[in-house]
Curated annotation (Swiss-Prot):
GO molecular function: phosphate:acyl-[acyl carrier protein] acyltransferase activity
Positions in coiled-coil regions: none
Annotated EC: 2.3.1.274
Lineage: Bacteria, Thermotogati, Thermotogota, Thermotogae, Thermotogales
Gene it is expressed from: plsX
The protein, known as: Phosphate acyltransferase
Amino acid sequence: MKKIAIDLMGGDFAPAEILAGALSFAKDFKDVELYLVGIEDNFKNVSLPENCKKVTVEDYLPMDIKPTEALRRKKSTMYQSCKLVKENVVDAVVSAGNTGALLACATFVVGRMKNIERPTLAVPIPTKDGFCVLADAGANIDVKPSTLLQFGVMGVEYAKFLGIKNPKVGLLNVGTEENKGTQKEQEAFKLLKEHFKKNFMGNVEGNDINMGKVDVVVADGFHGNIAMKTMEGTAKLIVDVLKSNIKKNIISAIGALLMKSVFNRLKEKLDPRKYGGTFFVGVNGIVVKAHGNSDRIAIYHALKVAKDGIEASLTSNIEEAIRNVWNSRYGRD
């Protein structure tokens, strides 16, 4: 039986929405055992199904906590959830808590994979024909060129997990020419080209991401996060503009009614709740970061992401890919 720990106190709507999403998931997936990690008050007047275990701890982390402080508070729901992965009690952990705190716990409690310089936050981004993977989406602000190569390798494994065959890789930059960007980007360009060969499509710009020019977009966390947040804002703008214009007159309202199925598909594609969560890849276990404002629907899907990651052996696939890169570059493991 697959086992997943969930941090009941992580997120803007914790614990009510987190618990509701977890219980809904437990009802639908009897082959998964959930470890509900929370404080005593979380479990008052709550009837748990057979495939849910209560793990009571003394502390929880606020959403504005610093990563260093998160590591010191070892009795928190997030820390203890990650510890369950470290001790092989569970196969995965899900949290909607502070991103920096979860990255710290993933890195130093769950532990980095051998030869990994930095774990990365790899995020699926909607494109016109499906998805691409953005790595890194905000976990590592400043990185080395060799780290960007590792982000590309891990991003490719994640893309394969999403069902993308023979993923194409691009480096996020300020232009498509090979000599664009800082020295870091220029050196990373050479490393990515050497490793991925024909599957490296060169530099890509922000406006290429949603068009599906590549399947994996490599970036440091600073630029990757800006790109992701810009896309989220643009998606919200599109939905808001459509809503406001539909209400302007009867003709618009009739047109909207006729195009209801189209709008529903657009809403579905742009709804972040349906993606649930994404992986911190490069650590010794499945660590899923759900959005901070996750409701019960988003938590349900985040747990589904964790379940799928376990079943696809995502961690071992990434570990093998990184080992191959390391051996090819340095001739040793």
